[in-house]
Amino acid sequence: AGPYSFGL
């Protein structure tokens, strides 16, 4: 997870 919503 991070500042953007990808599949991370």
Swiss-Prot record:
Transmembrane region positions? none
Q: Kindly indicate whether the keyword Secreted belongs to this entry.
A: yes
Spell out the GO cellular component terms annotated for this protein, sorted alphabetically and separated by semicolons: extracellular region
One GO BP annotation of this record:
neuropeptide signaling pathway
Carrying Leucine amide, the residues are 8
Query: What keywords are annotated for this sequence in UniProt?
Result: Amidation, Neuropeptide, Secreted
Per the similarity annotation, which family is this? Belongs to the allatostatin family.
Q: What is this protein called?
A: Carcinustatin-15
Taxonomic lineage of this organism?
Eukaryota, Metazoa, Ecdysozoa, Arthropoda, Crustacea
